[in-house]
Structure formats: structure tokens, C-alpha cells
Curated annotation (Swiss-Prot):
GO terms for biological process, alphabetical: auxin-activated signaling pathway; regulation of DNA-templated transcription; response to auxin
Cellular component terms per the entry's GO annotation: nucleus
Superkingdom classification of source: Eukaryota
Known role: Aux/IAA proteins are short-lived transcriptional factors that function as repressors of early auxin response genes at low auxin concentrations.
Sequence ranges assigned to domain PB1 in this UniProt record: 103-199
Ranges where the record places region Disordered: 1-48, 71-98
Name of the protein: Auxin-responsive protein IAA8
Major location category of this protein: nucleus
Induction record: Not induced by auxin.
Tissue expression remark: Highly expressed in green shoots. Expressed in flowers.
Length: 205
């Protein structure tokens, strides 16, 4: 009996109390308390990260919009492509497209004058402007196809020296200036020749 009593007395008080009450040791409740505290600190960090991402997206959106809207009509067209296209259109030629060109120089030769001269045809006002400019350049009386028949009759009764305007087309044929519309003339003319009205070469055109 004394041995049993001493054995019961030697048992720790805490063990008997835990076994009777059914409560968990205090050491097991400490870890969940720490995890709860640590999890409670995470939401502020997540919110700050979200705000940083939103501000970054806003900055990227503003940058992209400023780059894309260079051309209001076509946002996908770069400025360099627009500039290249504009320059190409200004210098373009082709049938009936002389209005896009900046100049159209041709050589002009006059009978009896050894040196030819260059003339820009685009600024001129049709055949009338062309003949007026040539008459001023070469100090000569020049007519063209529309007046040629009337002049041929009058020319037989006068001693004045007149000249007619002819041109060479892209195929190498010599024609009387004025036999085709002005726009078609600009697309086909290669060079001009001012011939005497009584020249056999003139009447062969």
C-alpha cells in the first residue's frame, strides 16, 4: 500500500489534470495562434500589389494609345509609310496622270537654230500657251494644227515667214501639234520641232 501511494504521489499534477479535463496541452494551441497572426498580415501586401499592377496597366495603356493614334484616319498606318506614299503620289506619272507630276521637260528644236532648248510643259495653258511661249523664246511666228489650214491659204499670198509646231511621239512618229487633245499630247510627246511652214518636212507630218 505504501508503494502504491508513493507511486500515485510521484505522478505529476498536470498529467492528472489533463487526463481528467480532456483539454489539449498549451503547446498545441500556440502554433495555430501564430499562423492566424501571420495570415492576418497578408491582405495589405496583396492590395498594394494590385494597386501597383493597376497603375502599370494605366501607364502602358496611355503609351500605346499615343503611339497608335498617329494617324486618326488609319491607326495601323505608320507615319513613315504615309510620308513615303505621299511623295510617291506627287512624283507618279502614267497615262492621264500628268497632274501628279511636278514637271515635264522636253527638248525643243527650231529649224536654223543648232542648239535645242528645254521647256516645261506642265505649267502651260494648253496649245495656246505652248505656242505663245515658243514664239517668245525663239522670236518667231508659230502656228499649230488648228490654224494650219487657214494659214496655208493666206500664206500663199504673203511673204512673211511663218513656222508650224510639230512633235515626235513615243513611237518615233512626227505629228502636227494640236491633232490630239492636250492631255493625250502630254502623255505621248517626246520632243518638239519648229519647222518652216513651207518646209517639205512640215507637210509630210
Amino acid at each position: 500500500m505504501e508503494c502504491m501511494a508513493s507511486t500515485e504521489e510521484s505522478l505529476p499534477a498536470s498529467s492528472s489534470m489533463d487526463s481528467c479535463s480532456g483539454e489539449l496541452p498549451t503547446t498545441t494551441t500556440t502554433a495555430p495562434a501564430q499562423s492566424t497572426a501571420s495570415s492576418g498580415c497578408r491582405p495589405p501586401a496583396t492590395a498594394a500589389k494590385r494597386r501597383s499592377l493597376i497603375s502599370t496597366d494605366l501607364r502602358l495603356g496611355l503609351t500605346l494609345s499615343s503611339v497608335v493614334h498617329i494617324d486618326g484616319n488609319n491607326p495601323s498606318t505608320p507615319r513613315s509609310s504615309l510620308t513615303t506614299a505621299t511623295v510617291t503620289a506627287d512624283r507618279g506619272g502614267g497615262g492621264g496622270g500628268h497632274g501628279r507630276r511636278r514637271s515635264l521637260f522636253v527638248k525643243v528644236y527650231m529649224e536654223g537654230v543648232p542648239i535645242g532648248r528645254k521647256l516645261d510643259l506642265l505649267p502651260l495653258d494648253g496649245y495656246k500657251g505652248l505656242v505663245a511661249r515658243l514664239a517668245s523664246m525663239f522670236r518667231a511666228s508659230i502656228t499649230y494644227h488648228h490654224c494650219h489650214r487657214q494659214f496655208a491659204v493666206v500664206g500663199m499670198k504673203t511673204n512673211k515667214v511663218h513656222h508650224v509646231l510639230t512633235y515626235e511621239d513615243q513611237e518615233g512618229d512626227w505629228m502636227m501639234a494640236g491633232d490630239v487633245p492636250w492631255e493625250l499630247f502630254l502623255t505621248s510627246v517626246k520632243r518638239l520641232r519648229i519647222a518652216r511652214a513651207d518646209d517639205k518636212y512640215c507637210y509630210s507630218c
